[in-house]
Amino acid sequence: MKLQKPKGTQDILPAESAKWQYVEGFAREIFKRYNYAEVRTPIFEHYEVISRSVGDTTDIVTKEMYDFYDKGDRHITLRPEGTAPVVRSYVENKLFAPEVQKPSKFYYMGPMFRYERPQAGRLRQFHQIGVECFGSSNPATDVETIAMAAHFLKEIGIQGVKLHLNTLGNPESRAAYRQALIDYLTPLKETLSKDSQRRLEENPLRVLDSKEKEDKVAVENAPSILDFLDEESQAHFDAVRQMLENLGVDYIIDTNMVRGLDYYNHTIFEFITEIEGNDLTVCAGGRYDGLVAYFGGPETAGFGFGLGVERLLLILEKQGVTLPIENALDVYIAVLGEGANIKALELVQALRQQGFKAERDYLNRKLKAQFKSADVFAAKTLITLGESEVESGQVTVKNNQTREEVQVSLETISQNFSEIFEKLGFYTQ
């Protein structure tokens, strides 16, 4: 019997979960400024929702999916990414209806699952924050969404981020480029890695972003997608580039970037930063104008991105970025004697109901041990409550940093601790 966590998963303990809550709250605040609303979808979906939209030949579907048959013999998969479930929800709930304002903007947060080799910043259960925007084919939507990602990364403190940009064009441009790539790579097939030999038959564009050395050599002189764009595709990409420049967002054209999912068209992008000599993608996404119709909805443009929370936190740690997390207690009550037990319970509850973060001793320890706990909790103020204080109704409240003290009534603490808190040099929000 295994009583440990499964391989590729982690327990997020309190010291770490505070960072997660900060990142999630920070993302919510940024997304709200751009008029995005949260959507929550199931963590498991029908297998076809993922396989048909992400692509039957992608690594996600062929190698990495957690899928199974449930007791009703339904083929189920744990979601490996966030876009397909959100699109499925958009169509199933008829959010394309005329009365729903367009563009429709959604964000999501939650666990995703892929069976892959666990490594730094990459787990089998990982967490993603993402956004999806439906109903606008305007290149300004591409740019606004990319700018929102840049805004988030800059404000949270990620350093040295570079925006890599490419286009896959419309279906006609992509088909022409696909054939040109097949014609170029077929004579080189024997020099490719085994995976890329398979990709050449199924999805040749995926050979371009292979990390294998032999594949990188093979594609060095490959044709560029930019040479196969028709007028519509070229105009869209030119507009995206111009608007990014208007907003002062620097970018690098990366024609070997294709993204790992089949549903993209036109603009695709990645934000990349270097950590210990390795390029790490922190956020990526693009346009997917055919996906809503693929799920049975009307022809609807889409654009979005996703970022991995574990990867983001790893980069912040490696770059020495300290998140401004407030963990300190406002009040710690040291309790002395059985006669003070009930009053301490009443007092700590009254403080919490006034909005203060408060804790008390429950273990009947010596005062020295209780004072140490107050220090460990970084308590701003300290109240020592014994039987004599209960009898007199008066107690000392101490600033646990400066040691300044004030003598006050228990009734005042129960009803208006803010006044005491401010008198000792702290401010209430």
Curated annotation (Swiss-Prot):
Keyword Glycoprotein part of the UniProt annotation: no
EC annotation from Swiss-Prot or TrEMBL: 6.1.1.21
Localisation: Cytoplasm
Quaternary structure note: Homodimer.
HAMAP family named among the record's database cross-references: His_tRNA_synth (MF_00127)
Family according to the record: Belongs to the class-II aminoacyl-tRNA synthetase family.
Any GO molecular function: transferase activity
Residues spanning the signal sequence: none
Native source species: Streptococcus pneumoniae serotype 4 (strain ATCC BAA-334 / TIGR4)
GO CC annotation terms, alphabetical: cytoplasm
GO biological process: histidyl-tRNA aminoacylation
Keywords noted in UniProt: Aminoacyl-tRNA synthetase, ATP-binding, Cytoplasm, Ligase, Nucleotide-binding, Protein biosynthesis
SUPFAM superfamilies hit by this protein: Class II aaRS ABD-related, Class II aaRS and biotin synthetases
Catalytically driven reaction(s): tRNA(His) + L-histidine + ATP = L-histidyl-tRNA(His) + AMP + diphosphate + H(+)
Organism placement in taxonomy: Bacteria, Bacillati, Bacillota, Bacilli, Lactobacillales
Protein name from the UniProt record: Histidine--tRNA ligase
